[in-house]
A protein has these predicted regions:
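Active-site-adjacent loop/tail segments of enzyme domains
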Residues: 56, 82-112, 138
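Active-site oxyanion/phosphate-handling segment shared across diverse enzymes
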Residues: 129-201
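Residue-level signal for inorganic ion chemistry
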Residues: 25, 61, 81, 100, ...
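Residue-level signal for short segments within beta-strands and strand-turn junctions
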Residues: 36, 86, 120-122
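Short, active-site-adjacent cap segments at secondary-structure transitions
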Residues: 21, 83-86, 170
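Anionic-ligand binding region
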Residues: 117-118, 125-126
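N-terminal polybasic phosphate/anion-binding patch
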Residues: 1-76, 89, 141, 188-191, ...
Length: 202
């Protein structure tokens, strides 16, 4: 897939405030508007039934896309979200040092999953939905190693409490799935559908 700047054939918005998702999109030549979508993520998670967390990720992404789509007529709106889970438990973004250490202690020596959900909406209607899942096994880490990592990367706004694009990748013994899925945007799937829909040039 070419990394050159893509020509936008139709108006496009990314419903995200995530700097890493912006960076990924721009690195693949997608230059469009980025607008943070305000949805009650915790309420959606609270009301979610079952343990198919890729479906929850899709639901969150769709709500974000629809919220912006309702405000911008004739714009294609991409919504993306991510759900980190271990043993049927969702790990939210830590927000602070203490929570990050707590989450990493749970992940240490264990396997968890990053679920990336994506949606595209147009004029308040769903055009496309999809998901991708990455499986990650973290090395057994001592408390000192965890604290040292948290101080190094400060992953307070990161799903899973680690920055895979930085030093976080060194925490793992095994990874199955795309690094972009782990970072919260399955760019390969997204580019394919944007080209298929004629929103951008290939």
């Amino acid at each position: 897939m070419s990394l050159d700047n893509k020509t936008l054939n139709k108006p496009l918005i990314f419903a995200t405030g995530s700097s890493i998702r912006k960076d990924i999109a721009k690195s693949f030549g997608i230059n469009c508007d980025f607008i943070k979508s305000e949805v009650d993520e915790e309420l959606i998670k609270l009301n979610f039934q079952g343990n198919k967390y890729h479906e929850l990720a899709i639901q969150l992404a769709t709500e974000k896309s629809l919220t912006i789509s309702d405000q911008y007529k004739d714009y294609y709106v991409v919504g993306v979200d991510q759900v980190c889970c271990i043993n049927n438990e969702i790990l939210n973004k830590p927000g602070n040092k203490e929570n990050a250490i707590f989450s990493l202690k749970k992940l240490s020596g264990n396997t968890h999953y990053q679920n990336c959900g994506m949606a595209i909406c147009l004029n308040g209607k769903i055009v496309w939905q999809s998901s991708a899942v990455a499986e990650l096994t973290m090395k057994p880490l001592s408390l000192d190693q965890i604290e040292e990592y948290v101080e190094l990367d400060k992953p307070f706004n990161c799903s899973g409490s680690y920055k895979f694009e930085s030093h976080g990748k060194d925490l793992f013994s095994n990874v199955k799935g795309s690094e972009y899925t782990i970072q919260g945007l399955d760019i390969d799937q997204l580019l394919d559908i944007l080209i298929k829909e004629g929103i951008i040039n290939g």
